[in-house]
Swiss-Prot record:
This is Photosystem I P700 chlorophyll a apoprotein A2. HAMAP family: PSI_PsaB (MF_00482). It comes from Olimarabidopsis pumila. PROSITE patterns: PHOTOSYSTEM_I_PSAAB. Phylloquinone binds at W671.
Amino acid sequence: MALRFPRFSQGLAQDPTTRRIWFGIATAHDFESHDDITEERLYQNIFASHFGQLAIIFLWTSGNLFHVAWQGNFETWVQDPLHVRPIAHAIWDPHFGQPAVEAFTRGGALGPVNIAYSGVYQWWYTIGLRTNEDLYTGALFLLFLSALSLIGGWLHLQPKWKPRVSWFKNAESRLNHHLSGLFGVSSLAWTGHLVHVAIPASRGESVRWNNFLNVLPHPQGLGPLFTGQWNLYAQNPDSSSHLFGTSQGSGTAILTLLGGFHPQTQSLWLTDMAHHHLAIAILFLIAGHMYRTNFGIGHSIKDLLEAHIPPGGRLGRGHKGLYDTINNSIHFQLGLALASLGVITSLVAQHMYSLPAYAFIAQDFTTQAALYTHHQYIAGFIMTGAFAHGAIFFIRDYNPEQNEDNVLARMLDHKEAIISHLSWASLFLGFHTLGLYVHNDVMLAFGTPEKQILIEPIFAQWIQSAHGKTSYGFDVLLSSTSGPAFNAGRSIWLPGWLNAINENSNSLFLTIGPGDFLVHHAIALGLHTTTLILVKGALDARGSKLMPDKKDFGYSFPCDGPGRGGTCDISAWDAFYLAVFWMLNTIGWVTFYWHWKHITLWQGNVSQFNESSTYLMGWLRDYLWLNSSQLINGYNPFGMNSLSVWAWMFLFGHLVWATGFMFLISWRGYWQELIETLAWAHERTPLANLIRWKDKPVALSIVQARLVGLAHFSVGYIFTYAAFLIASTSGKFG
């Protein structure tokens, strides 16, 4: 018999229905479940796929550089970053009529183009790129790296080059390479680039391959480094009148601690950032050399974990057994990696707007909004993934004997306390926050706005004051001119920092009031509820009150009716599925809040946010409805405009989102009957019945339909909000 898809599962390949195709796609990457898989092949497959992932990333970034160099306006933009709109790439569309061609021809282009809202122009400009030739060079180099990665992936699947399992489980060597090699050396290399290329470029000096060996990054060269006079590198920094990209007002310092922002670009000082990366490099280079590898010195992770005895015996056997549990479970490792990466991605979103690193990006409002939203959504998906793999760990890899009475076992032992506390926190936040919003809503509706319950966030204001914000009048820590912390930092970074935090032209420590207090608690509700569902799904993955032993049922067993006691909504996958809806919901509130507050800030009418954000109708009317006017007006009797594409995307996003419900709210029997009817009609229709199929068509399983519904819901939701965000922001600020 000829081999049928999927080749990795002969059992599935013999399935006579269309289930074969869908289950095949669903389990294609679940290497552990494939026929004849060994631990060694599992690790090698994953290792090789990492090279493929890198190849795709390099190819993609290369494509960004190439298209901007070919079809963009980088060189024109560099001359006037505040007024020229950066072009991402040209649009070729045979359906465009004259009005469309005119609407999308902008940024000094000859034909229709897409405007870039990704911030790449600002990024490339900041790191010292200036010409299209620079961009082409970068694109070629990344293409080369991409090819190298593909070769690397192929090579490590060849018998001679296949790493052994012991190599994959050598935790100390991996830490050494990742901490020192990946983070340490690359941070050091980046410091080198900033000092040798980016900082000179910001002062109007071009350093390229032809002259980098004879241009001194600092007048004193390496002298101060070897004589220990490191402070010389910080002397004579760029002045506050420095024009970025020119020598006017520039200094000679390369590693500084100025604090605050460059007055013209509104971004962090390049010399501060070089200093930061150097410090990070040294930290990680040291950290990577703390663990015992081939040389018999340094710490053994296993010894560290075994030796740690919790005080007073309150955590049982502490970390005993954890080393082998984690080191032998790729799901546990992936869960930890995803949790870390998710948090970092969310931190990137928060810091990219509050402490902008790239020149002029703070004045490109649409890009700021797009980047914040983009990183928060990605963080949400990554974080939910961490819990999904945590749950799979408990089902596939957790061994109770190996972890007796250690911190992991104790988490499981008191999971009911954890889950009930989270549940209580969610209920408390939900009822109180909604209660306040609804009360305020009713007061506004009855024409008595003065009867709203408005709570000042005094603790958060106190924290802002402690960091130096003076407008609240708290006079504490850095906002108190007589304090020791204030005096200690006054000669170094404080003047720049205090200047930045008390200026209204940036997003550092925005002034907050009752509207912020309410939406903060709405977001807290979303975070706690999402966490509740995810934590319960992971901790109950092996067994729960209703179903004490789920081990052999696996991660995503389906809803099986009441016949055998009922298994609806109690697989770990079901918890993940529900959590994603809550995650999207929460990020909706986060991005609505960020965007509305910033729109009013940028337009100079911040009182609109302050007054309208304390009741639900304010959010619906003054944020969503008011800002969607551009989207509802993309096509009208007068033709079209440059926002029309977003108007269509807004509609299309709603369509995709609504399609999700077709999969989420329906019975399998209905679809099965429909499929049978269509198949029957097809087989009895002349000409049509010439086309036959081998697999009997069957309706999607419950789990599959939920996945397809969730995918449509998520994609539609994000498409809709992306169009809203970009159109409403670019429509106002150009």
